[in-house]
Amino acid sequence: MSSQSHWLTAEERTQVLLDLKASGWSESGERDAIYKEFNFKNFNQAFGFMTRVALQAENMNHHPEWFNVYSKVQITLISHDCGGLTKRDVKLAQFIDKAAASV
């Protein structure tokens, strides 16, 4: 398992959560995960965004939990194999934010 799949240190966790919250992510109240909702102009934009994220997720072998209705995409990130938030989630969240900004 790569070092990116490992738990965050307490200091890393504090800093990355501040950064992620500043960009609209929130902590899941029920699990050690992060969540964000994205709204696009239409279904085509939402699906294009999801396609970009899916390709990156497959490349990382780290797949989001997500839900899509028309122009809305809801994403939860958690490392199931580790039982919580890891560096992989942070890296994918950062990619997701960049992908959403480019739509």
Curated annotation (Swiss-Prot):
Catalysed reactions, semicolon-separated: (4aS,6R)-4a-hydroxy-L-erythro-5,6,7,8-tetrahydrobiopterin = (6R)-L-erythro-6,7-dihydrobiopterin + H2O
Tissue spec: Highest level found in the kidney, liver, heart and ovarian follicles.
Recorded GO MF terms: 4-alpha-hydroxytetrahydrobiopterin dehydratase activity
Family annotation (Gene3D superfamilies): Transcriptional coactivator/pterin dehydratase
A biological process term (GO) from this entry: tetrahydrobiopterin biosynthetic process
EC number: 4.2.1.96
Signal peptide: none
CDD domains: PCD_DCoH_subfamily_b (cd00914)
Enzymatic class: lyase
Keyword tags: Lyase, Tetrahydrobiopterin biosynthesis
Family: Belongs to the pterin-4-alpha-carbinolamine dehydratase family.
Primary role: Involved in tetrahydrobiopterin biosynthesis. Seems to both prevent the formation of 7-pterins and accelerate the formation of quinonoid-BH2.
NCBIfam families, sorted: PRK00823.1-3
Protein name: Pterin-4-alpha-carbinolamine dehydratase 2
